[in-house]
């Protein structure tokens, strides 16, 4: 009598479309547009793409087009769902602390279902932690494929695993950004922004101990006596302590901005002249570059997206926690229109060439094709 996994493998062989399943922790709002794009493109390539996750970010206002199942983490429930989907390949997008990753990854391997891990390869806030890195390295060895946020992360992977690396430069779906026809001045007027030039900060402020360092910008503008230059802060989690330090003459806090078409946040980016996220730039860098905003940030523990920044070409990187240098670079760009325009043009050109949604999809497709082609006959489980 055939096991359920043998039936799963037999069903796969007679289907017209192959199936790739992404198993994720919380799906953030900015990933929804990405997965919608993946779903459409995978279908064009003869694949069915679906997502299984423990939750969808509550603030999400984007329409979910891709097949999506939301259910709390439970190994037995997830095993049942995987069997029902019968994927040709599974991609895990989970943290080490998501305990389900351990039984799930081993069961997938034991069942003969090829499994890849979408990974930063290390906790980049603590990249030299030997204990944590041992767990990362174990997963690198266990997986049939590794999808990296950027190529630079291969430095954390053993050369013996290079053959199973696939690079999918992390990005957002620029195709879903609306065209903004209003002028900078019209947008400023609608938001009540009186400044001739705007420095923009965006991001989740309270995340992991203010790692984006918005306080550095607040302190710069607290001491700045220039009515022509202002700071606009967008994001959740600004504490009362930080709010109390804001200079109301030149700083505006707009809070968290979400809307179904990304129109409001796109208008905010268009009205700005410079983007500064002093720490942990994340995908805010991609969004800033798309709108032609040079980035001014600090060295230190930065995420993979920092690879898109080239100091002096599309932005500036100053020494870590050097607030004086951060201030100097911001003011230099604000006062030198030609230099700002040069960096602006480079920023948009660079992000479109290095971090398009199609190139990101290409990394996922290449991984799925490789996993499916090397699929083993499952053993009983």
Over which residues does each language-model region extend?
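Conserved donor-binding/catalytic core segment of Leloir-type glycosyltransferases
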Residues: 21-23, 193-212, 218-222, 231-232
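Acidic donor-binding loop of glycosyltransferase active sites
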Residues: 267-283, 293-294
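A short, histidine- and acid-enriched strand-loop-helix "catalytic/donor-clamping" loop
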Residues: 113-131, 142-145
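A short, well-ordered alpha-helix in the C-terminal region of glycosyltransferases
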Residues: 325, 332, 339-353, 360
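Nucleotide-activated donor-binding/catalytic signature segment of Leloir-type glycosyltransferases, i.e.
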Residues: 240-260
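Conserved acidic donor-binding segment of nucleotide-sugar-dependent glycosyltransferases
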Residues: 311-323, 332-338
């Amino acid at each position: 009598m055939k096991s359920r996994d043998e039936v799963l493998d037999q069903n796969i062989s007679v289907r017209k479309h192959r199936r790739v399943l992404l198993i994720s922790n919380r799906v953030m709002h900015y990933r929804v547009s990405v997965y919608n794009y993946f779903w459409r493109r995978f279908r064009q390539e003869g694949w069915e793409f679906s997502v299984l996750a423990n939750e969808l970010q509550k603030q999400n206002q984007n329409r979910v087009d891709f097949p999506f199942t939301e259910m709390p983490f439970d190994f037995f429930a997830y095993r049942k769902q995987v069997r029902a989907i019968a994927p040709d390949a599974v991609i895990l997008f989970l943290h080490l602390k998501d305990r389900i990753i351990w039984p799930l990854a081993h069961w997938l391997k034991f069942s003969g279902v090829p499994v890849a891990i979408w990974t930063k390869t290390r906790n980049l806030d603590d990249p030299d932690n030997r204990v944590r890195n041992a767990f990362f390295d174990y997963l690198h060895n266990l997986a049939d494929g590794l999808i990296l946020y950027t190529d630079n992360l291969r430095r954390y992977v053993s050369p013996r695993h290079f053959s199973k690396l696939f690079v999918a430069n992390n990005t957002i779906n620029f195709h879903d950004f609306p065209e903004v026809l209003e002028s900078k001045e019209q947008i400023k007027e609608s938001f009540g922004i009186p400044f001739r030039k705007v420095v923009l900060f965006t991001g989740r402020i309270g995340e992991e101990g203010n790692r984006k360092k918005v306080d550095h910008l607040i302190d710069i503008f607290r001491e700045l006596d220039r009515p022509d230059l202002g700071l606009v802060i967008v994001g959740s989690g600004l504490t009362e302590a930080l709010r109390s330090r804001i200079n109301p003459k030149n700083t505006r806090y707009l809070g968290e901005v979400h809307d179904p078409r990304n129109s409001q946040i796109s208008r905010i980016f268009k009205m700005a002249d410079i983007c500064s996220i002093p720490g942990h730039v994340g995908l805010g860098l991609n969004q800033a570059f798309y709108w032609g905003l040079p980035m001014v940030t600090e060295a230190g523990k930065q995420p993979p997206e920092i690879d898109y920044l080239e100091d002096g070409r599309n932005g500036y990187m100053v020494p870590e926690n050097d607030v004086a240098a951060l201030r100097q670079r911001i003011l230099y760009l604000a006062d030198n229109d030609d230099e700002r325009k040069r960096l602006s043009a480079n920023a948009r050109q660079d992000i479109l060439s290095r971090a398009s949604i199609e190139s990101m999809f290409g990394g996922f497709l290449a991984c799925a094709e490789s996993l499916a082609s090397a699929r083993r006959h499952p053993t009983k489980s």
